Every structure is written in structure tokens, then in C-alpha cells.
Amino acid sequence: MNKFFTNILILVISFLCFYSKVDAAEILQVTSSSVLLIGDHNRTYTVKLACTEISPELEEKSVGWLKRQLPRHTKVNLKPQGSLDGMLIAKIIPFNSKIDITEKYINEGLATNNC
């Protein structure tokens, strides 16, 4: 009987481990028009948007647009492209979209593609 309860307990724990909610990376802060602070509940990353170049005169408008597109706690997928001076360079795709935020940025006329 004791072995039966042990097996049931192992089964319940296994079920909870395998079917628990997966936490994704999320936006913590828009630092500038091309730099974001992203966290995944135990680490934070400074991430630069890949393939973007923003002119200085559009900086303020670009930051506002980026904050509207990626508000705090927005879940995102990262596609790393490399790193520079300890900063991750990545494409960022919001969960509610299949389009990279860089493509949207360029389509809005706020950035140019430098890849």
C-alpha cells in the first residue's frame, strides 16, 4: 500500500513538472531607441535591436513609439545575432506578433536597415 502512494506521489510531481507554465523573456525597460532591458525571471540582458540605425533627430519619437509597441512586461522571443561590448544584439519578436520589431520600426520610417 505504501508503494502505491509513493508511485501516485511521483506521478503527480512528474505531471506538475512537465506541464508547468513556461516563462518567457519580457521587456523590463526601453532604455533608448535601440536598446532594451529584457529579463527572464532570473537574469537580465541589455539588448540592442539588430539591423537598426536611428537618426538623432528621430530619437525621442522613436523611443515613444518603441514604448507603445513594447510596454513593460511584454513577452518576447529573442533571436540573437551577436554581441558588442557585452551587449546582446538580437531580433525581438513579440509573442502576439510574428513580425520582428525591427521590421515594424523600418516600415514606420523611424529607422533604417543597416544589415
Regions found by a protein language model. Give the residues of each.
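Small beta-barrel nucleic-acid-binding modules, primarily SNase/OB-fold domains
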Residues: 5-7, 15-115
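N-terminal secretory signal peptides that target proteins for export/translocation
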Residues: 1-2
